[in-house]
Amino acid sequence: MDLQAQLEELKTKTLETLQSLTGNHTKELQDLRVAVLGKKGSLTELLKGLKDLSNDLRPVVGKQVNEVRDLLTKAFEEQAKIVEAAKIQAQLDAESIDVTLPGRQMTLGHRHVLTQTSEEIEDIFLGMGFQIVDGFEVEKDYYNFERMNLPKDHPARDMQDTFYITEEILLRTHTSPVQARTLDQHDFSKGPLKMVSPGRVFRRDTDDATHSHQFHQIEGLVVGKNISMGDLKGTLEMIIKKMFGDERSIRLRPSYFPFTEPSVEVDVSCFKCGGKGCNVCKKTGWIEILGAGMVHPSVLEMSGVDAKEYSGFAFGLGQERIAMLRYGINDIRGFYQGDQRFSEQFN
C-alpha cells in the first residue's frame, strides 16, 4: 500500500474511532490522540516515508500529510468538547433534583439541658412561694465580698479565685450579691423574704472534667422572724425530694462559709444504689449536693436588718452538678462545647 493510501486509511479509522468515544471515554480520547498525533504516533511514522518518495511526488504527499494532521487535530478538539459536555451532562443527570418533591422539614431546636434543669428547679421554688430575682454578672467587690462578710483582708477570699476587671469591679463568683441587694430593699412589714437568684458565675478555674471557669448557680435566701435550722432542713428535704424522688433523704455535715453561721454541707442519699454504696457515691451511700447555713448576723446588720429580731437561712446549688448527677454526665465541658450529639440526648 502506498503512502497516500495509508494516510487515507489512518484518517478514516481515526475519525471512526473518535465518533465512538463519549463522556465515559476521556482517557481513551487522550490515548488515541497520543497514538495518532504524538511524537511516536502513527502519523509521525508515516512521515518518515517521505524521504523514499520521488522529488515530484514528495510535495504532493507532504501537502496531504499536513491536511490530514490539521483535519485530525480539529477532529480531536471537537470530540474533546463533545466528550466533556457528555460527561458534565451525565453528572447533572445523576445529581438532578426533582423540584416538585417536598422539601426537607426544618430541624427544630430544643432547650439546652442546663436551661431545662434551671427551669425545673425554679418551678420547684415558685411552687414553694419563693420569688425569682435576677442580678448583675459584672458586680462590685463590695456586694460580692464585703456584704457577704468577706472584708478586704479576709483569708476566705482565697477560696474563690476571682476575675477582676478593676480593683473594685469583678465578675461575680456567686449570685449572693443579688441577695444582698434584695435584702436592702425588702419591706419586712409585708412579710418574710423568700427568694432564689439563679445565674451564671465565674471563677479562675482551669477547665477539666469537673471544673469550669463559668458555671450556673441558684442561691436561696429566707429571712423572717423565728427562722430556724429546722426550717432550713425541712426546706432542703422538700427540694431534694422534688428533684430526686420522695425516697431520698438528706444528711447535714458541719462546714464553713463566711456568710452563714452555723454552716453545713448537704448530702443526699445515693439515688443509684439507695445508700448501699456504688461508684457514683464513692461507696459512701451519700452524694454531696449543696452548701447551706443560717445567715450570719453581720450579713443581716449590713442590710439594716435587726439580727436580734430577724433570722434566716441561705443555700446554694449548681445546675451543672444537678444535671450531671441526674443524667450520669461525667464531664462538665460537654455542657459548653456545642456538640449536637451531646445536646440531642436531652431533647
UniProtKB/Swiss-Prot annotation:
Molecular-function GO terms, alphabetical:
ATP binding; catalytic activity, acting on a protein; magnesium ion binding; phenylalanine-tRNA ligase activity; transferase activity; tRNA binding
Q: Which reaction does it catalyse?
A: tRNA(Phe) + L-phenylalanine + ATP = L-phenylalanyl-tRNA(Phe) + AMP + diphosphate + H(+)
Superkingdom, taxonomy of origin: Bacteria
Q: Which cofactor does it need?
A: Mg(2+)
State a GO cellular component annotated for this protein.
cytoplasm
- Subcellular location per the Swiss-Prot or TrEMBL entry: Cytoplasm
Cited InterPro entries: aa-tRNA-synth_II, aa-tRNA-synth_II/BPL/LPL, Phe-tRNA-synth_IIc_asu, Phe-tRNA_ligase_II_N, Phe_tRNA_ligase_alpha1_bac, Phenylalanyl-tRNA_Synthase, tRNA-bd_arm
Keywords of this protein's UniProt record, alphabetized?
Aminoacyl-tRNA synthetase, ATP-binding, Cytoplasm, Ligase, Magnesium, Metal-binding, Nucleotide-binding, Protein biosynthesis
* Binding of Mg(2+), residues: 261
Q: Which GO terms describe its biological process?
A: phenylalanyl-tRNA aminoacylation
Q: Which NCBIfam families match?
A: pheS
The record's family statement is: Belongs to the class-II aminoacyl-tRNA synthetase family. Phe-tRNA synthetase alpha subunit type 1 subfamily.
Q: What is this protein called?
A: Phenylalanine--tRNA ligase alpha subunit
Please report the organism this UniProt entry assigns to the protein: Streptococcus pyogenes serotype M1
Source taxonomy lineage? Answer: Bacteria, Bacillati, Bacillota, Bacilli, Lactobacillales
